[in-house]
């Protein structure tokens, strides 16, 4: 019976000469063992990087509010200028109001409200998956704390 290498007309890899072999082997083993990509350092650590810009559709769909009456006393949190009556402001989902010239450049760089950090959706699938994973882990932690608390009450 012929060996695998004779059958396929190839030579065995020299692991000492090609360091990629060990790296690829480790990756294959970790995938086989269902190891997290985070453990391998192959995932961006979003907790230590700026989030991506807000999705264009999310920004386009933000409500525009016409400033009326007592709202004219409010100030834009970015430029600190008071809103003028009948001026149009952009309202974030968290209900903070901004001049469009102030908030649009901000949202082109990051996806959150500059005051409270309420996040808008992004067009970055990796970041959105990170947010879902983080929420799942937080829910799991909360359930475990509740379970632990229920055991000792």
Curated annotation (Swiss-Prot):
Instruction: State the InterPro entries in the record.
Output: Znf_RING, Znf_RING/FYVE/PHD
How is it modified post-translationally? Auto-ubiquitinated as part of the enzymatic reaction.
State which residue ranges cross the membrane.
Answer: none
Q: Which pathway is recorded for this entry?
A: Protein modification; protein ubiquitination
This protein's source sits in the domain of life called: Eukaryota
**GO cellular component annotations, sorted alphabetically?**
cytoplasm
Q: So what family is this one in?
A: Belongs to the RNF181 family.
Role played: E3 ubiquitin-protein ligase which accepts ubiquitin from an E2 ubiquitin-conjugating enzyme in the form of a thioester and then directly transfers the ubiquitin to targeted substrates. Catalyzes monoubiquitination of 26S proteasome subunit PSMC2/RPT1.
Self-association state and partner proteins as the record states: Directly interacts with ITGA2B and, as a result, with integrin ITGA2B/ITGB3. There is no evidence that integrin ITGA2B/ITGB3 is an endogenous substrate for RNF181-directed ubiquitination.
Q: What is this protein called?
A: E3 ubiquitin-protein ligase RNF181
Annotated source species: Bos taurus
Q: Which gene encodes it?
A: RNF181
């Amino acid at each position: 019976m012929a060996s695998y290498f004779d059958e396929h007309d190839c030579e065995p890899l020299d692991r000492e000469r090609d360091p990629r072999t060990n790296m690829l082997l480790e990756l294959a083993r970790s995938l086989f063992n269902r190891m997290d990509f985070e453990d391998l350092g192959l995932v961006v650590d979003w907790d230590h990087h700026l989030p991506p810009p807000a999705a264009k559709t999310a920004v386009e769909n933000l409500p525009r509010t016409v400033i009326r009456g007592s709202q004219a006393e409010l100030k834009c949190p970015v430029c600190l200028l008071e809103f003028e009556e009948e001026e149009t402001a952009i309202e974030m989902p968290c209900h903070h109001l901004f001049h469009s010239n102030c908030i649009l450049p901000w949202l082109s760089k990051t996806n959150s409200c500059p005051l409270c950090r309420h996040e808008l959706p992004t067009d970055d699938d990796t970041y959105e998956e990170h947010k879902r994973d983080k929420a799942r882990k937080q829910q799991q932690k909360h359930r475990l704390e509740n379970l632990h608390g229920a055991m000792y009450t």
